[in-house]
Swiss-Prot record:
It is an enzyme of class 4 (lyase). One of its GO terms (cellular component) is cytoplasm. It catalyses: 7-phospho-2-dehydro-3-deoxy-D-arabino-heptonate = 3-dehydroquinate + phosphate. This is 3-dehydroquinate synthase. Its EC number is 4.2.3.4. NAD(+) binds at residues 71-76, 105-109, 129-130, 142, 151, 169-172. Binds 1 divalent metal cation per subunit. Can use either Co(2+) or Zn(2+). It comes from Shewanella pealeana (strain ATCC 700345 / ANG-SQ1). It is found in: Cytoplasm. Disulfide bonds: none annotated. It comes from the Bacteria. Pfam families: DHQ_synthase, DHQS_C. Belongs to the sugar phosphate cyclases superfamily. Dehydroquinate synthase family.
Length: 359
């Protein structure tokens, strides 16, 4: 039986359905698809695995020709967005259209942004197939594409009608992609829930072996935390920024190394360690906290150091373009212990250079 987490945003509230074998029935989605045209957006990797199954599930509804995009962060661009818009226009689809994002974070972000933009807004549904998208990017309404000068710089806040998470999809996920998703899972423990962090420490092998109960609990807990945060601060004016732990450093790594060279979760992992080291140098946490965070990330074979080829100047030029920068001042999300974090705008360049040089 599927577990449901509700994101409560008044008229824009929506359910997250979490379970196994959810692609066998259209029941969770039926209410959003009646009298609608349905355009599925997916990629070349996911289409052979799940597209036929989803089309069969939706056979009672009006599905049109799907959009199949190339796979990878490097294709999260306005050019590929235009492929979605062209398909919508060529098939004469109007505001009675529902877009379905079938894939990972890139597909979800692009489909959501297309839905927010097309004819000033059409409905969309998230069917995330990677761990990272299931626990993070499919929930909360952040949609965007990248720009050569910065990640997720062009986008909108736009909530889905429903999120359908089938944990069975993780059985086809490459190990590297699974590990990248665990960086976001661990983030929730660091910023919000010390008990969950400890549970993760105690269940590394169960998660790595794709134990069904462990996966469903971890995904559900992450979605519960994400829903709680989004309900308090939908457009990231305050507490939602905490979800960006590791991302200011991480986005700099992605932009400098080239999108897709480091997976997003890998960059967030290294960025989380850099944030923890910064906290330690500011006296916010002792070294044992840095060690626990680093050890848990390393247990999932994630990188815990910055790329050897990046120096301070390369980091800082990208970090200064971060969306959290306010009045020219860099704001970092830093752990204050296990289970809590804060926003800090008084970190000097000298300290950051010290952190980056020793990481």
């Amino acid at each position: 039986m599927a577990k449901q987490v509700l994101v409560e945003l008044g008229e824009r509230s929506y359910p997250i359905e979490i379970g196994q074998n959810l692609f066998s029935s259209s029941e969770p989605l039926a209410r959003y698809l009646q009298n609608k045209n349905i355009l599925i957006v997916t990629n070349e990797t996911i289409a052979p695995l799940y597209l036929q199954q989803i089309e069969a599930m939706l056979s009672d509804f009006a599905c049109v020709k799907p959009v199949i995009l190339p796979d990878g962060e490097q294709y999260k661009t306005l050019e590929q967005m235009n492929t979605i818009f062209t398909s919508l226009l060529e098939q004469n689809l109007g505001r009675d259209t529902v877009l379905i994002a079938l894939g990972g974070g890139v597909i979800g972000d692009m489909t959501g942004f297309a839905a927010a933009s097309y004819q000033r807004g059409v409905d969309f549904i998230q069917i995330p197939t990677t761990l990272l998208s299931q626990v993070d990017s499919s929930v909360g309404g952040k949609t965007a594409v990248n720009h050569p000068l910065g990640k997720n710089m062009i986008g909108a806040f736009y909530q889905p009608k429903c999120v359908l998470i089938d944990t069975h999809c993780l059985s086809t996920l490459p190990k590297r992609e699974f590990a990248a998703g665990m960086a976001e899972v661990i983030k929730y423990g660091v910023i919000w829930d010390a008990e969950f962090f400890q549970w993760l420490e105690n269940n590394v092998e169960a998660l790595k072996s794709l134990d069904t109960q462990a996966l469903e609990y971890a995904i559900s807990r992450c979605c519960e935390i994400k829903a709680e945060v989004v309900e308090k601060d939908e457009t990231e004016q305050a507490v939602r920024a905490l979800l960006n732990l590791g991302h200011t450093f991480g986005h700099a790594i992605e932009a400098e190394m080239g999108y897709g060279v480091w997976l997003h979760g890998e960059a967030v992992s290294a960025g989380t360690v850099l944030a923890a080291i910064t906290s330690n140098k500011l006296g916010l946490v002792d070294e044992s906290i840095v060690c626990r965070i680093t050890a848990l990330l390393a247990a999932f074979d994630l990188p815990t150091t910055a790329p050897d080829t990046m120096d301070f100047e390369q980091f800082i030029k990208h970090m200064r373009r971060d969306k959290k920068v306010l009045k020219g001042q860099l704001r970092l999300i830093l752990p204050e212990g296990i289970g809590q974090a804060g926003i800090y705008s008084d970190v000097t360049d000298e300290l950051l250079e010290e952190v980056i040089s020793c990481a």
